[in-house]
């Protein structure tokens, strides 16, 4: 590690010194996060690089992604790596992603919370897990983790690499810093040529465009009993949904429902917030608008009078997408860059979104070109488009079909990513075989 650290720019030297000095304050930060529901009390030590889980024998691939979106994108890749008889350690930073990992990771994969990025905790993490290969997903770049990986001679690969124009412009202000971090990576696998070009401009080498892994995710699962119960509760009612919504978007959906219910009196709007703990606040918004609303987290199903059904639970978007022929994908009216439209598209929904979709810019551009999605800007344009689709099911089906065909044509990133990783996996196998001889 020291050899790599000697070549770092002053900014990263300063970062390493500051994070080392801040190590005694770590319990204060973790305690604050625990109070705000951002940590699991039984797993706090993982943030300090301590684990109650033993390292499995044999070769170990470490995969790190920030949160739910990155984890969902990489689960099929993890499954394929496990099939090759590698153990996989998966780290992420949020409680929601930890819950998702518990539900969806394959046998042979272990989840841990990512450590706080201080030299002491990072060294403790590496001393315990001793990964043979490190894979970072998209854009969650922690300097001490990256520098230590390189310093210990662990091959480091970026998969599904994404660098928005906004992030690119920020990194350009510290060119030496980002060039040093990207220089630690043996291989950068980018989502598109545009992202690859930005990485190249910032100093990365060995860049390959492999495509977006999120295009190859399977349909989200739905628990059979839960789906049957929800279907029975809604009956023949007309359903629209808002998925992975952020603050402000629920107000738009509630207002749009008020505008639509005169023409469609049996309309039911389902809202699945990105952060389920916001459910009670959304309930208040609906009640303030004079609408009958209920929360799924209370074990309630929509009744005949329910107008807004708030699905404030984790891992149940598959239920919503199987019932709603029209889905608004959140994070796109709010300035969050948009959430993933792929899953509802694969389940046959017609997609609406706001103008802020830079997280999935290439996908939305392709959907726009194929007329596979429609942009809305407020409750008025949303209600107008939904009303038109509810009156003309053929038009709605045409849009949904165009979206499915577009997503299918853009796919293949998983196989290209696996092909790029295979030489590294083969090298690990050979080294293990030689050490056991």
Where are these regions (language model features)?
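Acidic donor-binding loop of glycosyltransferase active sites
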Residues: 129-133, 306-336
């Amino acid at each position: 590690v020291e050899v790599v650290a000697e070549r770092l720019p002053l900014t990263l030297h300063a970062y390493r010194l500051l994070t080392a000095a801040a190590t005694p304050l770590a319990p204060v930060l973790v305690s604050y996060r625990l109070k705000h529901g951002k940590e699991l009390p039984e797993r706090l030590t993982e943030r300090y690089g301590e684990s109650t889980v033993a390292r499995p024998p044999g070769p170990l691939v470490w995969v790190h992604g920030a949160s739910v979106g990155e984890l969902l994108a990489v689960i099929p890749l993890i499954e394929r790596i496990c099939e090759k008889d590698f153990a996989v350690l998966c780290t992420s930073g949020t409680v929601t992603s930890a819950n998702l990992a518990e539900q969806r990771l394959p046998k042979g994969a272990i989840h841990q919370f990512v450590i706080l990025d201080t030299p002491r905790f990072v060294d403790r993490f590496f001393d315990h897990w001793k990964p043979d290969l490190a894979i970072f997903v998209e854009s969650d770049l922690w300097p001490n983790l990256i520098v230590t990986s390189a310093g210990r001679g662990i091959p480091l690969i970026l998969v599904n690499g994404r660098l928005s124009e906004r992030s690119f412009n920020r990194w350009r202000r510290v060119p030496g810093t980002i060039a040093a971090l990207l220089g630690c990576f043996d291989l950068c696998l980018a989502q598109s040529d545009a992202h690859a070009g930005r990485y190249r401009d910032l100093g990365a080498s060995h860049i390959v465009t492999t495509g977006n892994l999120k295009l190859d995710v399977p349909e989200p699962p739905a628990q059979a009993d839960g789906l049957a119960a929800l279907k029975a509760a809604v009956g023949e009612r007309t359903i629209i949904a808002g998925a992975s919504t952020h603050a402000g978007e629920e107000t738009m959906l509630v207002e749009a429902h008020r505008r639509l219910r005169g023409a469609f009196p049996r309309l039911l709007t389902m809202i699945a917030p990105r952060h389920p703990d916001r459910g009670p606040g959304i309930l208040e918004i609906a009640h303030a608008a004079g609408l009958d609303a209920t929360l799924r987290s209370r074990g309630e199903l929509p009744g005949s009078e329910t107008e807004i059904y708030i699905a404030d639970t984790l891992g149940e978007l598959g239920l919503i997408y199987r019932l709603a022929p029209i889905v608004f994908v959140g994070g796109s009216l709010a300035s969050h860059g948009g959430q993933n439209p792929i899953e509802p598209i694969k389940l046959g929904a017609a997609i609406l979104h706001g103008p802020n979709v830079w997280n999935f810019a290439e996908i939305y551009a392709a959907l726009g070109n194929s007329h596979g999605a429609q942009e809305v800007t407020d409750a008025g344009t949303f209600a107008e488009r939904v009303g038109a689709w509810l009156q003309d099911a053929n038009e709605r089906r045409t849009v949904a079909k165009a979206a499915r065909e577009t997503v299918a044509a853009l796919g293949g990133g998983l196989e290209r990513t696996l092909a790029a990783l295979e030489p590294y996996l083969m090298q690990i196998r050979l080294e293990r075989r030689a050490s056991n001889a």
